[in-house]
Amino acid sequence: GNRYYEFAHLLAGLNVQWCIVEQPHFVTYGQQNLQTEQLRFFATIEECLAVVHCDVLLMSSVLQYLPQPYEFMRHALTHQFANVVIARTQFTRDTHDRLVVQRVPQSIYNASYPAWMLSKAKFQQLFVGYECLAEFDCHETYQIGWRRQIPQLGMIWSCLTAT
């Protein structure tokens, strides 16, 4: 949800609602402490779409932390968002995914998380009925092992049949 504050100044004066779908404890906190007419919090995409019409789905540093990223994305695409933005996501050039352990630097806090490095080719096959408008480097890297840095990438997709 922190992307909202990064882009809020660009949205000033526009009739935009930014809806965040998050884990339940973040939703509760957001609804109680941060929610405004422009910023809303929901537990599921369906809960959000029941209240708000959404033109854009933004997935920023999300998919790699989901237990089943392909299933989640397949389900999300059934809603035919006019545009889908994938950002800050690690992809491999391989035809298979890699499950890795992300270690948070101790200067931030001591933790480790399972994370996916998704096959870019396999991931792009999900976007049937969408056109890829752009691919971009997010200028962040993901460290694997001691030396290997994997760039975080992004993509912008447009639905060919959205109304």
Where are these regions (language model features)?
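Short alpha-helix
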Residues: 110-138, 150, 154
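Conserved beta-strand signature within the Rossmann-like core of class I S-adenosyl-L-methionine
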Residues: 80-98
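Class I (Rossmann-like) S-adenosyl-L-methionine-dependent methyltransferase catalytic domain
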Residues: 13-15, 35-37, 105-114, 147, ...
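A short SAM/SAH-binding and catalytic strip from SAM-dependent methyltransferases
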Residues: 54-70
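Class I SAM-dependent methyltransferase SAM/SAH-binding core
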Residues: 1-48
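A short, conserved alpha-helix within the catalytic core of class I
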Residues: 65-81, 86
